[in-house]
Amino acid sequence: MSVVEQYARAHIVSDADIAEDEAIPVVLRYDPDIDPRSVRVGLPGPHEWTFSRALLEQGLRAPAGSGEVRVWPCGRVQAVLEFHSPQGVSVVQFEQKALLRFLRRTYMAAAPVRG
């Protein structure tokens, strides 16, 4: 099975003085050989979260999660991922289509090969 790595742009949701249009690079990663049920989201710096692929999929339809990672749709074209750690909370807004494309690729990578 092959690793899926997709680069996306996202916006940090904050009340700080950050430009509204300023997007950050994010790495979405799926490695079925390590854990076929998990995905990873890497933000700039040493910030990376691993969580259930099912949580990401559920959160694109309705609010999901109750622990360190929460996901919910935001309007018709956005999705929000909220990450909790001892250092605080990071709230990141994505285009839903980027997350859907990533999920589609993860299912294709995990699909059994039929001969």
Task: Kindly label every feature range from the protein language model.
Residues M1-G115:
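Positively charged, low-complexity terminal tracts
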